[in-house]
Amino acid sequence: MVEWTDKERSIISDIFSHMDYDDIGPKALSRCLVVYPWTQRYFSGFGNLYNAEGIMSNANVAAHGIKVLHGLDRGVKNMDNIAATYADLSTLHSEKLHVDPDNFKLLSDCITIVLAAKMGHAFTAETQGAFQKFLAVVVSALGKQYH
């Protein structure tokens, strides 16, 4: 079980309460697909993923990026039981979709980069530490079914 300080809980809740899901989600997933092109294989039904411009303007990518962030919001609401919160999603990604669990970390890094760019100076080291701890716990939970 993960220990969360009151400060970490506050930072994470604050980030998600102010996050523009419609902006951050599409940008983060698009960045992941452009920077790590091998991740595109999981999105073959999304249409044009042939170049950065096509990815960045792809409505399916944008919608899934938003969906991912709303999925993270479930973790924020269940910080004391993140593993159980993502158990079904872990099973889906491992057994049906066969997603390499390393890709969850890549996407979490892209989310962090996009969020940091959006928050600017407000994305302090303390904020980054709490946010990345949260994402690491979620990534671990999503990878549970693979172990």
Swiss-Prot record:
Pfam families: Globin. Residues 3-147 form the Globin domain. One of its GO terms (cellular component) is haptoglobin-hemoglobin complex. One of its GO terms (molecular function) is oxygen binding. Heme b binds at residues 64, 93. GO terms for biological process: hydrogen peroxide catabolic process. Keywords: Heme, Iron, Metal-binding, Oxygen transport, Transport. Red blood cells. It comes from the Eukaryota. Involved in oxygen transport from gills to the various peripheral tissues. PANTHER family: HEMOGLOBIN FAMILY MEMBER, HEMOGLOBIN SUBUNIT EPSILON. Belongs to the globin family. Heterotetramer of two alpha chains and two beta chains. This is Hemoglobin subunit beta. The lineage of its organism: Eukaryota, Metazoa, Chordata, Craniata, Vertebrata.
